[in-house]
Amino acid sequence: MALLDDVKSELAAFEGDSPAAIKAQAAAMIRFGGGLRPVQNTYVIQAVFTSLDVAEWLKNTLRNTFGHEAEINHLTRQTPNGPVETYVVLVTRNVVALALQTGLVDRRKQQVRGLPSEVVNGSIAQIKAAWRGAFMARGFLSDPGKASFLEIACPTEEAAMALCGVARRLGIQAKHRTLRSSERVTLKDPDAIERMLKLMGATRSAREWTGKRSDGEARGKANRLANFDDANMRRSAKAAAEASEKVQHAFEVLGDNIPDNLRQAGQLRIDHVDKSLEELGKIAEPQITKDAIAGRIRRLLQLAEKTEKARAAEGK
C-alpha cells in the first residue's frame, strides 16, 4: 500500500489546473468516493477516502472553489489485516446547491449516475482531472513485481462506462468489468499504466513504479534464460509478442463486439506474453487445449480483419 499512498499524496499535491479542471476533479472525487446520501428526511454529501491528504484537498477545494464548508471525520475500522484508517468529508449545508455545482444532479435535480456531461464533453485537462479524482477516491495500483494493473472501483456501471469513454479521448484503452457485483475499470498494459499515471500528474510515482517493475522483469527474464535455450526462447517470445500486438489491435477494432470466449483467449495472450499456448490453455477458466486457444485467437484476428475490411468498404 505504500506506493499507492505515495501516488495519492502526489496527486493531492498536483497544482496548475484551470478552475474547470479543479471542478472536474472534485466532482469525480465526490462521485466515486460517496455522493449524495439521504439522512433523516434530508440529504448530505459525503466522500470517504483512505488518505488524509486527499480528504484535505477536497475540503479545501469545496471552500475555496465552490464556497461550501465541509468537515473531515476520522474513522478507524478493524479488519483481519489490521486497522484501516478512513477520512469522511461531509457537507451538511446547502447540499442541493453543491450537488448542482458538482454535477451530482442535473438541472431537473435528477441524480446523475455517470459523470457530469460537462466533464464527459469537456477539455482534455478536465478529463485528466476526472481520472485523477476517481483514482484518488477509489484507485488501486499493483505492487512492482506482481501482475501489472491499475484499477478504479466505480459506484455504478454508468460511471464505469463514462470513465472508459473519456480514457479513449486520452488515447488509452481501459476495460470495464464486473467483479463480485462491483463495477471496475482496469488497465493491465504496463505502458498504458505508466502513461495514465503521468497524465493524472503522478510523474514521480510513475517513474518509481516503472523502475521497480523493470527490475523485477529483468530478474525474471534472467532466471528464465538460465533454464532454457536462448535462441528458442527468444524466437518464441518474439512470436508471442507479435501475437499480443495483433490481439491488442483486434480489441481496438472490435471494441465491445467480441464473443466472450474469443475475448478471454485474447486477454490471456495480452496478459501473459511470456507463456506458451499450452500454458495459456492451463490458466484459462475452464482449462482448454493449446489448439483450442490458438483457434480462438485466430478467429478473433479474422473477425477484426473482416470488420476492418467492411469499414473500409463503407468509407469508399
From Swiss-Prot:
A Gene Ontology BP annotation from the UniProt entry: regulation of sporulation
DNA-binding region location: 276-309
Molecular function, one GO term: DNA binding
UniProt KW keywords: Cell cycle, Cell division, DNA-binding
Source species, domain of life: Bacteria
One Pfam family of this chain: WhiA_N
Coiled coil location: none
PANTHER family: CELL DIVISION PROTEIN WHIA-RELATED
HAMAP family recorded: HTH_type_WhiA
Similarity comment: family membership: Belongs to the WhiA family.
Job description of the protein: Involved in cell division and chromosome segregation.
Descriptive protein name: Probable cell division protein WhiA
Lineage: Bacteria, Bacillati, Actinomycetota, Actinomycetes, Bifidobacteriales
Gene: whiA
